[in-house]
Structure formats: C-alpha cells, structure tokens
C-alpha cells in the first residue's frame, strides 16, 4: 500500500501517530481503525493532511499483481496526475463562496449594459458618417474597373446576404469553435478546466462564469447549441437590437452560472459545468415570451410542430423536475436561471434597464464632445 511506503520512508508520520496510541505503529493503527476499502488514494490524502506534510509524497502506481487492485483501477492510475490537479474541495462555509460571484454578476451585468449603450451611441455616429462616405465610395466605384470572380467579393456578398442577427452571432459561434479547438490541446487541459468550467468549489470563481459560456468539450453539444442560437438569432436581434442583444447574452451567461452555483451549494452536488446552454435558454425564452404563438419544430422531426409558448412551458417544467430530482446529465439550474432571466427581461427588464440608459449616454456624449482640446497652452 502507498501508506506503507510512506511509513518506511521515515518522514516522521509514524512517530507522531505512535505517541498518541500507546506505541502502535502506523501500520497497526491503520489496520485497527480503517476498513480495507478506505486504504485507497483518498484516505492517503486525508492522512497526509492530518500529518501536516509540507511536500506531497511521490505517488506510487499500483501494480498489476497487487491484491485488491482491479484492472479498471490500474487503467485509471495513468489519469491520477491530471485528476488530482482538478480535484475540487468545497468550502467549509459554502454560503461565503457565493459572495464574490454575486458581486461579479451584478457588476458585470451593469458593465455589459453600460457598454452596450455606449456601443449603440457610437454605432449611430458611425452610420451617419458612413452614409456620406458611401456616397463618395459609390461614385469612385462607378469609375473604377470592377474585379470579377474575386474571392473577397464573394465573401462580402455572402456576408451582406446574412441578416443582422446572423451577422451578430457569427462572432459568438467563432469564439465557441476556437475554445472547442483549445480543448484538444493536451498542454492546455489544466488551464481549460480551471478557467473554462464553472464550479463553486473551484479556487477560481468569477472569470469561469463568463468564459464557460463559450466552452464546449463535446462536438455534439456545441453543434446543438450553436444551431439553436443561429435559428433564433434573427428574431432576438429584431426584438432587442444588436447592442442590447449582446448585453443580454453575455449577462445571461453569467447569471445562469450564478444560479447554477446557488443550486450546487444548496444541494451539495458539486461539479464543473460548461456550455452556452444557459445563455441560449435566455434567448429562447425571450423569443417565446415575446412571440408565444410562433410555431416551432424539433430538428430531424419537422413534422411535429408546437407553439413557442407551450415549448417554453415544457422546457421550464423539465428543468424544474431535473433540478428537484437531481438529474445530472444537464445543469438544470443554469437552464432554469437562463430561462427565467429571459422571461423577466422582455417583460420588465427592457423597461427598467434599457430605456433608462439616457443619463449614461449623455455623460458619454459630454465626454466625447467636451474632451481636452488640441493645441492648448497659456495665453
């Protein structure tokens, strides 16, 4: 056993334990107090903490001939280093672990909508400028020889044929594909697990709430989420506009992850989560709430159609049941949080947040127009 190897190396653990049990050695103490099934790796880690080792001992790989070591355990032994690097230990005060994520959620949501308001202001200014620039460009194009069959021209034609919503989510899809490719780089596995999966038991709590929204490990998971996002992109951008949609989408990713944190802390079912499902549930719920009579169909089963309102009710019911019953295949708390945020925003949030952005826009306008002038100096 690994514990036996530690005792023979003479690191002082045997003496520390022997004095408290009347001279019994570590091996005798372990045999008396510990059932055989607890002499595995987890128990060794517990003993290590109690003995106060400053340096983790070298891990001893189980041999094939060791009794009590199954073939499955031997195959998994090669995974011990990366698994140990990603073991999550819940805080002894789990409620405290939600304080930083709560402040991050509120702060990020405010920054997202504030940035979106400024973005919209800048977009309106650039559109006015581009209108006059376009008149000049059209005149130059009329006298400039045109290139036929140019690849760039074909790309521009394809891009211009997309709707505003499709052009908006193209960047989101590209970011998800990039992160999916990064998961395939072995040297980045620890970084990806640390920053691109959300877990309230992790040491890094805040940044994964946003980054995990763009993270997918499974190709099918990513393809399904991006298909739904692409399908609803035109509708949601027509309802909210490009800038407001981006603020809602990014905020939804953080909010749904915070609800997931709350659910995991409340139930004690800790584990990493990733994916854009929470943010996409916000998009789906917002569209279904705004257009409840719209007709939807299931992919690969287009003959079965149903109203958007009924689809939303079914999804909420399923995620509520999954959260209560402890289904582990999906992060139902994140799905439910995203759906409720989408319903709330199109019902109340648009009036409370977006329509009250004017004071911020005026401040930004003052900064832009009354900034420091060039060529100053004393008179």
Swiss-Prot record:
Residues on Mitochondrial intermembrane side: 122-167, 231-244, 290-295, 355-379
Residue numbers bearing the Phosphothreonine modification: 69
Consequence when changing residue 77 to E: Abolishes the beta cleavage
UniProt topological domain (Mitochondrial matrix) ranges: 53-101, 188-207, 263-272, 319-332
Keyword Transmembrane helix: yes
Disulfide cross-links: none
Outcome of substituting residue 277 to G: Loss of PGAM5 cleavage
Pfam family, one: Rhomboid
Protein topology in the membrane: Multi-pass membrane protein
Keyword Transport: no
Subunit comment: Interacts with PSEN1 and PSEN2. Binds OPA1.
Family to which this protein belongs: Belongs to the peptidase S54 family.
Biological role: Required for the control of apoptosis during postnatal growth. Essential for proteolytic processing of an antiapoptotic form of OPA1 which prevents the release of mitochondrial cytochrome c in response to intrinsic apoptotic signals. Required for the maturation of PINK1 into its 52kDa mature form after its cleavage by mitochondrial-processing peptidase (MPP). Promotes cleavage of serine/threonine-protein phosphatase PGAM5 in damaged mitochondria in response to loss of mitochondrial membrane potential.
UniProt protein name: Presenilin-associated rhomboid-like protein, mitochondrial
Gene: PARL
């Amino acid at each position: 056993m690994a514990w036996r190897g530690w005792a023979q190396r003479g690191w002082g653990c045997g003496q520390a334990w022997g004095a408290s049990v009347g001279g019994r050695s570590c091996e005798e103490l372990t045999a008396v107090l510990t059932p055989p099934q607890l002499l595995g790796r987890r128990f060794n880690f517990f003993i290590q903490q109690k003995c106060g080792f400053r340096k983790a001992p070298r891990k001893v790989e189980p041999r094939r001939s060791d009794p009590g070591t199954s073939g499955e355990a031997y195959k998994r032994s090669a995974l011990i280093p990366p698994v140990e690097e990603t073991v999550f230990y819940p805080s002894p005060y789990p409620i405290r672990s939600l304080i930083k994520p709560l402040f991050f959620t509120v702060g990020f949501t405010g920054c997202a909508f504030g940035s979106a308001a400024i973005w919209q202001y800048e977009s309106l200014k650039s559109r006015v400028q581009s209108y006059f620039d376009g008149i000049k460009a059209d005149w130059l194009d009329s006298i400039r020889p045109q290139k036929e069959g140019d690849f760039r021209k074909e790309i521009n034609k394809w891009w211009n044929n997309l709707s505003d919503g499709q052009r908006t989510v193209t960047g989101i899809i590209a970011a998800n594909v990039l992160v999916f490719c990064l998961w395939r780089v072995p040297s980045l596995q620890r970084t990806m697990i640390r920053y691109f999966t959300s877990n309230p038991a992790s040491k890094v709590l805040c940044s994964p709430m946003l980054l995990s929204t763009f993270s997918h490990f499974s190709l099918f998971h990513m393809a399904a989420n991006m298909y739904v996002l692409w399908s609803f992109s035109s509708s949601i951008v027509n309802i909210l506009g490009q800038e407001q949609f981006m603020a809602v989408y990014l905020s939804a990713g953080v909010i749904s992850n915070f609800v997931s944190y709350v659910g995991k802390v409340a139930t004690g079912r800790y584990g990493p989560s990733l994916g854009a499902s929470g943010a996409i549930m916000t998009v789906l719920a917002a569209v279904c709430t705004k257009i409840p009579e719209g007709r939807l169909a299931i992919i690969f089963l287009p003959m079965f159609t149903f109203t958007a309102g009924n689809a939303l009710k079914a999804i909420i019911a399923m995620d509520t049941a999954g959260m209560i019953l402890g289904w582990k295949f999906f992060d139902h708390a994140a799905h439910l949080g995203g759906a409720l945020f989408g319903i709330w925003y199109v019902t109340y949030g648009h009036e409370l947040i977006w329509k009250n952005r004017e004071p911020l826009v005026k401040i930004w306008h003052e900064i832009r127009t009354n900034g420091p002038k060039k060529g100053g100096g004393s008179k």
